[in-house]
């Protein structure tokens, strides 16, 4: 055939119309007419497939077919083809030589070529005669015409099965078609045509292997394709078919023609399995896909071109010339595509193709194929005679042919439209780039190169309107219900353009349009094409859709029309009816657009996708717009069309117009079908296929038709019976329908909106708003969409909207029950579940009514207000999905669906396969029975629990008992689950499973061993198990795959707590999923209940203090595993807090318990030896705690809000701020605070009552504020302050913090607002921290200085008067940290209060921040962000800390310990750490905080910097991410001022009474740390790093060393001191400070170091802050203090150079620089001073701490670490290390003494320490670090001596000024310019006065640390400590610099670097030695 066809082509130009031509040419003709014949022949020979595309526009269509065939050929017959191509080429050349003029006379030539090709394929020769005889006078159009048919009748033909489309049956079929459709008698076409048809249909039977491209295309359904491919069959019919097909895509016929003309190709096709049309089509397509096609074009192009040229020349000479003109341009255009591959070949192709095209054009012209296509094949029928030859090509009318000439090749067009290649590798004809995989193609089509090539293509073919043509195709397809004809008509031009369409076909069958058009050309092809197209389009439609999304709207446009046409062929009536229904529903236009865009968007329903336009790319984006539309109703395509490019719009319009015409026609039918049409919206983002939709609704009845509008994510479904629609609507009321796991919304098109609303309302009613409905947000990223149960609650949709849960204020944080706010938006009740439980709680508390931001209607769900509706939003979509399902189920249960709920039961499906099944498949098991409510798939146990209506369950059991179902080879066992089974209670199900495995398991005590892990990937169970095994044996586990959740049962509660703490501090990512971890919510249920009480509110502060718990609770809440009841019962925060609290002090009073929760330190202290004092404090603390906890509850809400904000970031920030706003009463509260202060001082009970009242007020205010999310960020701070004042210390802290906060708070709030605006709290915080730090630093410093100066006496008095109160405040500040978070904003309050608040706040804030960070971040922020945030916090904390540390190391120690403990607590380590750490931490915190009120300045500086970071984080977290931003901002402000003012000395002074407790607490804390080491350490580190990266890191380093020293001793006892490296250091520092306070020397050293840290951090490396005398002391003590300062200051450089990284350096540029300067100093001096080394140790420990959390963990885990720290301290003689070591060990003893002589400690501490340090510095450093008070005292003395030495060394510089004379004033005067330093200086001056009065105690350092705040107030007289001045001391180089610049220059000097390196080396060496000694000693 090929040869004959080819010859006939050569002969055919004139003869083609003749029977021989049809026979020989017919195959070519149908494919490309004469040209196509040549092409087909060349396809085989030269892979003419590509060439045919190039040959002519019609050939482009032809190419479509041939391409496909060729593609297959390429695959199957690549070698044979090559051979044949060669033969064909030679033959063609020969033929060309012979009959150039008579290309249409190819018949003869064909015989010649056949001879040549016969060698390759003998059949060709045989068929060629047949072809000749068959095609002699008739082309496809002529054949059709002979039957009185037109191209449009091809559609009818396509309806015949391929099997029937045999040459024998074809005439009968054609006649039948004629009789039925045309009413004409089908002329008896010669059997030749039938034979030809047979050949076409039976590629094997005839050389026209695949007219059967239809089969190749895989459209067995399309008899048209067969016919098309059987152009030989009735010439008229074939011609018509070809015309239509050519119009459609000319490729299908072309392949046949090509194959025919290229007889060997046909043979090859057959040989290559192309004989079977169906197989050939598909295989051909696949083979041909892109590159092969290109290859064919290239290889076959030239050879084919030459023969074709000759033939074409003759043809051109013939009437075909006109046709060729029309067709040639397309062929040429097509050629360019190919020609890009082979320009020469393309040209050749074009030349020969022109003649061929001419012949085909002649046919087309005569037939008016285009007209025929559009109007029907009447014209083609007419024209086939004169143009019969061309009629093969003429499928394109002359105009079409002309267009073709001007059009690119089909391959080029396919590439232009980004049609998915059918075969890979695909060679982009535009770019000559080979894409081996679809992925590569998708990437390539989005490259600038390809886009530019597309641009050039359009320029190259100005006559080609890629958009218009596709639209025309669409129009043609759509206008004429007989899409085949129309398709062929409109597509033929389009195809000419769309030769690309053939390309597309080749590339991706998904472009149904192209494929379909080829079918259209030949009815058989069309039909088959359609059927296969459908199957393929369905399978590939995603690709198509993807392609459009990829930015290949072209593909969509071209494809959608084809799809539509195919679809029309398949069910044009149905489709019309559907479309009509759509239009009638008012969505007609939109629907048309949808159709067009549909093709562009996704090939859900191939036929449905009209070609939006060649520029379908725009349509890709319209999907997003349409998403919103679909959200509203999914009806209007206007948004999409708007979004679409104008071209696309124009195409869409055109298409829609034609579609409208179709629809109009269909409207009549529509009326019949209208009631049976459904609109499905919110389809999956990744698209769905028609088959998916059918599969979903098949259970309800027969699905007549499906129309998918991908760009709108909508589909129209026509059911056979209206009853099915009713059943569906009823069904969806109770059970959401899901496609690919995403719930879709379903409504009746006409009533779409109304129904959606009704349905969703019904759903809401039925589910009482518990069902979260899907909300389509254009910004899916902004919120998690929770789909109401009505619309399947799908995780995918959960992304779009976040269900907000309003916490009712009355519930307070304790009632964290998440209330589902359901709003009905566009028929969608959307429940936004705050990702973070805190916000949920807040919102839930806020309003019983569920408010949906996106919802048009807020649905009040009073019952739901407390519904936990497990609308626990997971951080991830999975969580959201789970939450959605849980929420829906829960809501359903909680809501009036009680009937349903009562009727609901749980089905157990067991024996599921290990893999290979989807949630949908499990859903499908129950879906047909209706009443499906929820599902829980336990993939780990191969079980699934399905919550379903009882009746349905019974039916289900009966059915599956009778008809067992297999899934992946496993026979499922379906039975009823126990009656009491609650599918939402994942833990209960887990326990059931545990019982099955271990009947003896103790269920009562098992909950505390559960660890809930959410957001797991599908294959993440093993990873999680591996993680769990690191913390202990995993006894049992369950993986809930559909909720992406796992529950592990570890061997002990400690392991669970450790794992939880670790994962909280170190969120783990598995792939793209960040794990969220939580403990069993049931552990905290009691506390949650308590939380409901005012006491519980206290607990909620505690929870805040341990945000980890909140996180856990929230995670629990977020994770479906948390039951709504659990959520209701326990507020998320309180759950975790309680767990920790219960573990720590379950026996404490509720008030105390609350206090403990808020301040575990308080409880611990009580538990500790200081229990009496603590008890005294506890009343105060309790009262304070009550107020604080009430406030904290608010704060907790804020914290929750903060967390929510973290997850929701800015949005929620406003709400969190609202809680603060609720705190707005804080103005009055301030007065109250003062009153509270008095009350607390006077009567703890009164204070408690008062605070409690305030707290309640605050809670109410918070509730109100929550309502007004951003009402007042500042006021919330005030409220916090108000709560804080409840405790004198807390009040002072609050006031201080408020004062600082007010300035900072204003900025912070503003920034917070800004941050709220921003979505990433971390980023905002970071930026804000820096900006605010810089801005607020001066203000904060000034405020802090003033406040500190004021507070110092007041705080000292307060703490002295209420030492326990101080502790209580310390505890309270934990609550307060929440409150202080608020208080931070309200800096206006008295600074002492602020300081106290800040001190406690740091913990609470750290906790909250950490918890929030961890919580929120795990949920909303990527782990990197969390880490970054944590780093930021650490940096902030570090900066603050270094400042504090510099201000006073002791202060740093005491302050940092609380801070760190707060950090640890805040970091979710707090509670766990608090539990273990509570003893120490609580003790410290109490001591610390009691001191902190006094020492608040330094703590405020340091803690405030940290806590501001943390407290402000809390404050700002409640506000929103701003909390953190503000934290960062405030950190800069607070870091310096707070650290300097709230000096650790002050804290220590206040803490001294509790220091005795602290030692036990330390041990306890270490134990706790051991218990919660990882989480706490990690949290602490992360938090510390992130929260107070600047101050904390430096401070943490120093303090950490101290704490580590302390906790090393304790760590020896408690291996888990590790967890709280920072805390440990903090505790140690606190202990040291307390010891120092008791023993002035120790405290002074710590203070000096702390102040140095504070100063260096706060002020530009206020290492000089140490008074010169102190520096001298430090120097005397081997610069121990200086070393501390140096180490701290140096820590940054050391960290940088060594592993020691100063958060300060890292955190803040300014502070970092100052710290570096200080460090430079220190480092320069350190080598000289062992103290410096000690500092380095501290630094290293700190860096380890901060970075690794390892030092603490190591110290905890390894007593070696403690020993190392001690040894390091001893060896290094760092003041910090020594002090820390001494104070750590000595703190235990000294702290008792210090606790007794808290007021005396500053002088004693420093003086004693100095002496001891000098005397027994190194020896005692070791012994002190290991032994205790004596060593500590000695160390303090040594440190003092060293500090003095250092100071002396530094004395010449500013430091001397500051230090000795306590040149605080000088320092202040000297560096007043520095906001922080100046402020610190002024405070230091005050403090210096105090210190001067207490010179013994090394007030210098105390002053430095207290100069920040408390020290002045606490021990104003005794604080001889260095005034935070601008001087800097380099401990490493033992040099003092008056200015930061000088220090910076020094630090940059080579000498300093060398000294630092030496120092680091020495430090490392000493550390190693110490470690070795410790190990040996151990």
UniProtKB/Swiss-Prot annotation:
State the SMART domains in the record: RRM, ZnF_C2H2, ZnF_U1
Sorted keywords for this record are:
Activator, DNA-binding, Isopeptide bond, Metal-binding, Methylation, Nucleus, Phosphoprotein, Repeat, Repressor, Transcription, Transcription regulation, Ubl conjugation, Zinc, Zinc-finger
Where is the sequence biased in composition, kind Basic residues? 486-543
One Pfam match: RRM_1
Q: Which InterPro entries match?
A: Matrin/U1-C_Znf_C2H2 (IPR000690), Matrin/U1-like-C_Znf_C2H2 (IPR003604), Nucleotide-bd_a/b_plait_sf (IPR012677), RBD_domain_sf (IPR035979), RRM_dom (IPR000504), ZNF638_RRM1/2 (IPR033096), Znf_C2H2_jaz (IPR022755), Znf_C2H2_sf (IPR036236)
Domain (RRM) ranges: 676-751, 905-979
Glycyl lysine isopeptide (Lys-Gly) (interchain with G-Cter in SUMO2) crosslink: positions?
292, 775, 1676, 1820
Q: Which residues carry this modification: Asymmetric dimethylarginine?
A: 47, 49, 54
* Sequence ranges of Polar residues compositional bias: 610-633, 1113-1122, 1132-1142, 1378-1392, 1408-1417, 1444-1465, 1507-1525
Give the primary localization class. nucleus
Q: Where are the zinc fingers (Matrin-type)?
A: 1928-1958
Q: Which residues bind DNA?
A: 1353-1477
Q: Where does the protein end up?
A: Nucleus speckle
Task: Output the Gene Ontology terms for molecular function.
Answer: double-stranded DNA binding; mRNA binding; RNA binding; zinc ion binding
One of its GO biological process terms is: regulation of RNA splicing
Q: Which residues carry this modification: Phosphoserine?
A: 128, 289, 299, 369, 383, 420, 552, 605, 614, 636, 1100, 1401, 1641, 1667, 1882
Give the span(s) annotated as Involved in localization to nuclear speckles: 472-571
Record's PANTHER family?
MATRIN 3/NUCLEAR PROTEIN 220-RELATED
Record's subunit section: Interacts with FHL2. Interacts with CEBPA, CEBPD and CEBPG. Interacts with MPHOSPH8 and TASOR components of the HUSH complex; leading to recruitment of the HUSH complex. Interacts with SETDB1. Interacts with HDAC1. Interacts with HDAC4.
Task: State the function annotated in the UniProt record.
Answer: Transcription factor that binds to cytidine clusters in double-stranded DNA. Plays a key role in the silencing of unintegrated retroviral DNA: some part of the retroviral DNA formed immediately after infection remains unintegrated in the host genome and is transcriptionally repressed. Mediates transcriptional repression of unintegrated viral DNA by specifically binding to the cytidine clusters of retroviral DNA and mediating the recruitment of chromatin silencers, such as the HUSH complex, SETDB1 and the histone deacetylases HDAC1 and HDAC4.
Q: What is this protein called?
A: Zinc finger protein 638
Q: Which organism is this protein's natural source?
A: Homo sapiens (Human)
Gene name, per UniProt, is ZNF638
């Amino acid at each position: 055939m090929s040869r004959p066809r080819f010859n006939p082509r050569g002969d055919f130009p004139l003869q083609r119309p003749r029977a021989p031509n049809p026979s020989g040419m017919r195959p070519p003709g149908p494919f490309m007419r004469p040209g196509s014949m040549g092409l087909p022949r060349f396809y085989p020979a030269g892979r003419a497939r590509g060439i045919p595309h190039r040959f002519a526009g019609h050939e482009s269509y032809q190419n479509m077919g041939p391409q496909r065939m060729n593609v297959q050929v390429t695959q199957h017959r690549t070698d044979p083809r090559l051979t044949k191509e060669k033969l064909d080429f030679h033959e063609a050349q020969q033929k060309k030589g012979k009959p150039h003029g008579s290309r249409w006379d190819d018949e003869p030539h064909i015989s010649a070529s056949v001879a040549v090709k016969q060698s390759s394929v003998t059949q060709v020769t045989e068929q060629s005669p047949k072809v000749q005889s068959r095609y002699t006078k008739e082309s496809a159009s002529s054949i059709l015409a002979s039957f009185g048919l037109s191209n449009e009748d091809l559609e009818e033909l396509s309806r015949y099965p391929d099997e029937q489309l045999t040459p024998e049956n074809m005439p009968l079929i054609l006649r039948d078609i004629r009789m039925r459709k045309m009413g004409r008698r089908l002329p008896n076409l010669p059997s030749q045509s039938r034979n030809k048809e047979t050949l076409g249909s039976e590629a094997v039977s005839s050389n026209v292997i695949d007219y059967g491209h239809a089969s190749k295309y895989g459209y067995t359904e399309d008899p048209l394709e067969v016919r098309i491919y059987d152009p030989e069959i009735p010439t008229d019919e074939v011609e018509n078919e070809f015309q239509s097909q050519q119009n459609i895509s000319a490729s299908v016929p072309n392949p046949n023609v090509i194959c025919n003309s290229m007889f060997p190709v046909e043979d090859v096709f057959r040989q290559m399995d192309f004989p079977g049309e169906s197989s050939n089509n598909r295989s051909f397509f696949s083979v041909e896909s892109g590159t092969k096609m290109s290859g064919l074009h290239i290889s076959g192009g030239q050879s084919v071109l030459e023969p074709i040229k000759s033939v074409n020349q003759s043809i051109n000479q013939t009437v075909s010339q006109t046709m060729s003109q029309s067709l040639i341009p397309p062929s040429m255009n097509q050629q360019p595509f190919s020609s890009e591959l082979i320009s020469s070949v393309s040209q050749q192709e074009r030349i020969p193709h022109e003649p061929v095209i001419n012949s085909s054009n002649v046919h087309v012209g005569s037939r008016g194929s285009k007209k025929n296509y559009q109007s029907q094949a009447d014209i083609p029928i007419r024209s086939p005679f004169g143009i019969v030859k061309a009629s093969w090509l003429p499928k394109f009318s002359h105009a079409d042919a002309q267009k073709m000439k001007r059009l690119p090749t089909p391959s080029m067009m396919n590439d232009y439209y980004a049609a998915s290649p059918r075969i890979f590798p695909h060679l982009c004809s535009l770019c000559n780039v080979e894409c081996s995989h679809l992925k590569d193609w998708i990437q390539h089509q989005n490259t600038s190169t390809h886009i530019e090539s597309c641009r050039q293509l359009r320029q190259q073919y100005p006559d080609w309107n890629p958009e218009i043509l596709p639209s025309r195709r669409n129009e043609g397809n759509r206008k004429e219900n007989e899409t085949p004809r129309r398709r062929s008509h409109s597509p033929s031009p389009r195809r000419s353009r769309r030769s690309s369409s053939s390309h597309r076909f080749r590339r991706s069958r998904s472009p149904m349009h192209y494929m379909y058009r080829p079918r259209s050309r030949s009815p058989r092809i069309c039909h088959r094409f359609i059927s296969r197209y459908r199957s393929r389009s369905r399978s590939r439609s995603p690709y198509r859709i993807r392609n459009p999304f990829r930015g290949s709207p072209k593909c969509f446009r071209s494809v959608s029309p084809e799809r539509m046409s195919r679809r029309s062929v398949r069910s044009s009536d149905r489709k019309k009816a559907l479309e009509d229904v759509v239009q009638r529903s008012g969505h007609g236009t939109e629907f048309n657009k949808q159709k067009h865009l549909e093709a562009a968007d996704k090939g859900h329903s191939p036929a449905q996708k009209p070609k939006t336009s060649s520029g379908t790319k725009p349509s890709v984006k319209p999907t997003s717009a349409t998403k919103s539309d679909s959200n509203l109703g999914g009806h209007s395509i206007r948004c999409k069309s708007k979004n679409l490019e104008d071209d696309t719009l124009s195409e869409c319009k055109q298409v829609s117009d034609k579609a409208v015409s179709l629809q109009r026609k269909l409207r009549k039918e529509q009326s019949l079908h209208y009631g049976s049409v459904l609109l499905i919206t919110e389809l999956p983002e990744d698209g769905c296929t028609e088959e998916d939709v059918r599969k979903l609704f098949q259970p309800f009845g027969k699905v007549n038709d499906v129309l998918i509008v991908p760009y709108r994510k909508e589909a129209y479904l026509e059911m056979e019976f209206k009853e099915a629609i009713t059943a569906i609507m009823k069904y969806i009321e109770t059970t959401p329908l899901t496609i690919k796991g995403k719930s879709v919304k379903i409504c009746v098109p006409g009533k779409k909106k109304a129904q959606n609303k009704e349905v969703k309302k019904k759903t809401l009613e039925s589910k009482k708003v518990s069902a979260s409905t899907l909300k389509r947000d254009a910004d899916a990223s902004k919120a998690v969409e929770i789909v109401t149960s009505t619309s399947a609650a799908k995780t995918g949709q959960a992304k779009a909207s976040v269900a907000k849960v309003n916490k009712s204020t009355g519930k307070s944080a304790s009632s964290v029950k998440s209330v589902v706010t359901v709003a009905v938006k566009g028929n969608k009740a959307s429940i936004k579940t705050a990702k973070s439980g805190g916000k949920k709680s807040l919102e839930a508390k806020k309003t019983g009514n569920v408010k949906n931001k996106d919802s048009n209607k807020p649905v009040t769900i009073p019952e739901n207000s407390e519904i936990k509706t497990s609308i626990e939003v997971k951080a991830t979509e999975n969580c959201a999905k789970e939450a959605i399902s849980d929420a829906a189920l829960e809501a359903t249960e909680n809501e009036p669906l009680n009937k349903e709920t009562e009727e609901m039961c749980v089905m157990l499906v067991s024996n599921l396969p290990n893999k290979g099944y989807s949630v949908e498949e499990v859903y499908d098991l129950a879906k047909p029975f209706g009443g499906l409510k929820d599902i829980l798939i336990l993939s780990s146990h191969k079980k699934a629990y399905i919550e379903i209506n009882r009746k349905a369950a019974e039916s289900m059991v009966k059915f599956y008992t009778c008809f067992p179902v297999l899934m992946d080879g496993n026979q499922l066992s379906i039975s009823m689950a126990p009656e009491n089974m609650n599918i939402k209670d994942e833990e209960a199900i887990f326990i059931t499973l545990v019982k099955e495995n271990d009947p003896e398991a103790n269920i009562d005590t098992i909950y505390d061993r559960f660890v809930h892990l959410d957001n797991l990937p599908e294959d993440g169970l093993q990873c999680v198990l591996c993680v769990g095994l690191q913390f202990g044996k995993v006894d049992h586990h369950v993986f809930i795959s559909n909720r992406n959740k796992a529950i592990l049962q570890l061997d002990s509660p400690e392991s669970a707590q450790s794992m939880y703490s670790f994962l909280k501090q170190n969120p783990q990512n598995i792939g793209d999923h960040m794990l969220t971890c939580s403990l069993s919510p049931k552990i905290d249920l009691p506390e949650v209940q308590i939380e409901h009480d005012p006491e519980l509110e206290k607990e909620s502060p505690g929870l805040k203090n341990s945000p980890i718990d909140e996180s856990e609770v929230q995670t629990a809440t977020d994770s479906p595993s948390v039951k709504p009841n659990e959520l209701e019962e326990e507020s998320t925060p309180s759950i975790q807090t309680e767990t920790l609290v219960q573990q720590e002090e379950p026996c404490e009073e509720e008030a105390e318990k609350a206090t403990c929760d808020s301040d575990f330190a308080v409880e611990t202290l009580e538990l500790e030896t200081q229990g009496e004092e603590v008890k005294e404090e506890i009343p105060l603390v309790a009262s304070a705690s009550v107020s604080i906890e009430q406030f904290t509850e608010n704060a907790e809400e804020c914290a929750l809000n903060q967390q929510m904000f973290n997850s929701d970031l800015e949005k929620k920030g406003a709400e969190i701020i609202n809680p603060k706003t609720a705190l707005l009463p804080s103005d009055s509260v301030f007065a109250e605070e003062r009153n509270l202060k008095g009350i607390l001082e006077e009567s703890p009970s009164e204070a408690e009552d008062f605070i409690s009242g305030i707290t309640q007020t605050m809670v109410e205010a918070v509730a109100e504020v929550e309502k007004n999310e951003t009402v007042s960020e500042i006021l919330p701070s005030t409220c916090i302050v108000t709560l804080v004042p409840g405790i004198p210390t807390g009040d002072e802290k609050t006031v201080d913090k408020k004062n600082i906060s007010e300035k900072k708070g204003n900025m912070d709030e503003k920034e917070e607002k800004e941050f709220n605006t921003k979505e990433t709290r971390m980023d905002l915080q970071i930026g804000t921290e820096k900006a605010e730090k810089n801005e607020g630093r001066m203000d904060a410093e000034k405020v802090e200085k003033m406040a500190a100066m004021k507070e110092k006496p007041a705080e000292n008095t307060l703490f002295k008067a209420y030492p326990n109160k101080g502790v209580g405040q310390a505890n309270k500040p934990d609550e307060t940290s929440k409150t202080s978070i608020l208080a931070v904003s309200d800096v206006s309050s008295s600074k002492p209060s602020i300081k106290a608040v800040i001190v406690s706040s740091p913990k609470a804030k750290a906790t909250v921040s950490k918890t929030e960070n961890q919580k929120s971040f795990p949920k909303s922020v990527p782990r990197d962000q969390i880490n970054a945030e944590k780093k930021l916090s650490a940096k902030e904390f570090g900066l603050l800390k270094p400042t504090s540390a510099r201000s006073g190391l002791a202060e740093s120690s005491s302050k940092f310990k609380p801070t760190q403990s707060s950090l640890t607590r805040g970091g979710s380590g707090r509670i766990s750490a608090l539990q273990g750490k509570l003893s120490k931490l609580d003790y410290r915190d109490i001591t610390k905080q009691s001191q902190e009120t006094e020492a608040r300045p330094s703590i405020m500086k340091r803690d405030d910097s940290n806590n501001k970071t943390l407290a402000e984080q809390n404050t700002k977290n409640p506000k929103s991410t701003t909390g953190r931003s503000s934290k960062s901002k405030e950190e800069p402000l607070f870091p310096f001022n707070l650290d300097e003012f709230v000096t650790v000395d002050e804290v220590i002074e206040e803490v001294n009474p509790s220091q005795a407790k602290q030692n036990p607490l330390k041990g306890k804390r270490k134990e706790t740390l051991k218990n919660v080491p990882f989480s706490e350490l990690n949290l602490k580190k992360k938090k510390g790093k992130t929260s107070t990266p600047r101050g904390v890191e430096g401070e943490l380093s120093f303090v950490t060393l101290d704490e580590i020293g302390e906790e090393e001793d304790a760590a020896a006892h408690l291996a888990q001191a590790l967890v709280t490296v920072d805390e440990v250091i903090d505790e140690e520092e606190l202990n040291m400070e307390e010891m120092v306070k008791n023993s002035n020397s120790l405290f002074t050293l710590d203070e000096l170091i702390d102040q140095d840290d504070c100063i260096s951090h706060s002020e530009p490396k206020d290492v000089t802050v140490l008074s010169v005398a102190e520096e001298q002391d430090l120097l005397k003590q081997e610069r121990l203090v200086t070393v501390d300062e140096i180490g701290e200051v140096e820590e940054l450089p050391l960290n940088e150079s060594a592993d020691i990284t100063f958060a300060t350096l890292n955190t803040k540029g300014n502070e970092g620089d100052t710290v570096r300067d200080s460090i430079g100093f220190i480092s320069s001096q350190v080598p000289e001073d062992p103290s410096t080394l000690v500092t380095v140790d501290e630094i290293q420990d700190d860096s380890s701490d901060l970075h690794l959390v390892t030092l603490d963990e190591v110290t905890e885990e390894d007593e070696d670490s403690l020993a190392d720290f001690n040894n390091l301290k001893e060896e290094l003689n760092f003041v910090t290390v020594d002090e820390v070591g001494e104070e750590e060990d000595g703190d235990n003893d000294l702290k008792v003494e210090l606790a007794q002589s808290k007021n005396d400690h500053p002088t004693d501490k420093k003086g004693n320490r100095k002496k001891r340090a000098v005397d027994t510095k190194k020896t005692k450093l070791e012994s002190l670090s290991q032994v205790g008070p004596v060593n500590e005292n000695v160390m303090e003395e040594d440190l003092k001596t060293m500090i003095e030495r250092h100071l002396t060394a530094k004395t010449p510089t500013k430091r001397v000024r500051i230090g000795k004379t306590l040149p605080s004033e000088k320092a202040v005067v000297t560096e007043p310019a520095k906001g922080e330093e100046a402020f610190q200086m002024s405070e230091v001056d005050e403090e210096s006065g105090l210190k001067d009065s207490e010179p013994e105690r090394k007030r210098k350092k105390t002053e430095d640390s207290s100069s920040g705040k408390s020290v002045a107030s606490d021990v104003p007289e005794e604080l001889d400590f260095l005034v935070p001045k601008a001087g800097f001391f380099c401990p490493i180089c033992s040099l003092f610099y008056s200015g930061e610049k000088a220090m910076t220059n020094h630090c940059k000097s080579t000498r300093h670097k060398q000294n630092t390196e030496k120092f680091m080396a020495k430090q490392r060496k000493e550390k190693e030695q110490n470690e070795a000694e410790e190990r040996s000693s151990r």
